[in-house]
Structure formats: C-alpha cells, structure tokens
C-alpha cells in the first residue's frame, strides 16, 4: 500500500492545501494529513478546530485520514508506515527551503521520499500566515479557505 503524509500546521486549512491534496490522491492509496504540534508556536486555531475543519473538507474522501503528531515528521512517517511525504511548492524560496528539509529527512530516514507538488498559479499567493493576519483584522477570508472550514470559524 502506497501511503503518504501531508504534514503542516493547517492553521487554518486553505484552498491551496486542498488543491495539493486533491492532486496528490491519484498517486497514493492513502494520504494522512498530519497536523504537526509545534511547541514553539502559539496556534491561532485549536488543534480540535483544525481537525474538525480538515475532516469536514475531506469527509467524502475515503483515502484521506487526519491525525496529529509531535516530534520529527520523518519519525511520524515511520509510525504510520508512510514511504512518501507530500510538500506543496509555491515559490522558488519554498523550493529551496523544502529541498533542504527533504535532504535532511533523507539523511535521517533514507527510505522516505519527498514529493513536491507545485501549486497552481491561482493559489501561489495563499498562505495560512496571510489568512491568519486577515482573520485577526476581521477581514473576509471566504475566497481563501474551503467553505466547510469557513463555516467552522
């Protein structure tokens, strides 16, 4: 079984995340969305809220499951038997950053491959960081996040 992990904070999930996930599904038998718990960052949305949002967005997709994890992402890959890690790439700087991480991950656990999926042009400017800033300033984020997630804000 080809299992992939799509890790992130998803704080909140965006249409760009959804696009990358949907485009990756034909490549794998199962994709685990891994919500990483980062002790150095204060989250905007609770972990439960993020799980609910992701489950609502993908409730009709049997190949996707949502889990949380702490620690090294490659160790979580091993725990869930994922041989692949999906990463979305928006910009050249994303690529440079993700390439460095992928190389470090490969040094730690050589059997886990990083799969880069380039975002569609319409989604390349969307990031959770920008969406959070808009939310903090009472702006309208409807065009940037899936409606199922928006309904849970």
Question: Can you annotate each of these PLM segments?
Answer:
Residues 1-153:
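Nucleotidyltransferase catalytic core that binds NTPs
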């Amino acid at each position: 079984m080809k299992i992939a992990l799509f890790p992130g904070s998803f704080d909140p999930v965006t249409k760009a995340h959804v696009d990358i996930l949907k485009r990756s599904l034909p490549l794998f038998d199962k994709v685990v969305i891994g919500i990483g718990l980062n002790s150095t960052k204060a989250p905007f949305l609770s972990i439960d809220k993020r799980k609910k949002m992701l489950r609502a967005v993908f409730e009709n997709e049997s190949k996707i499951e949502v889990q949380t994890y702490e620690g090294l992402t490659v160790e979580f890959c091993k725990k869930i038997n994922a041989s692949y890690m999906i990463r979305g790439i928006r910009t050249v700087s994303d690529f440079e950053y993700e390439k460095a991480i992928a190389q470090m991950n490969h040094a730690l656990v050589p059997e886990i491959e990083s799969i880069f999926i380039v975002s569609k042009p319409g989604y390349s400017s969307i990031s959770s960081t920008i969406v959070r800033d808009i939310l903090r300033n009472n702006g309208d984020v409807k065009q940037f996040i899936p409606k199922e997630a928006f309904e849970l804000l």
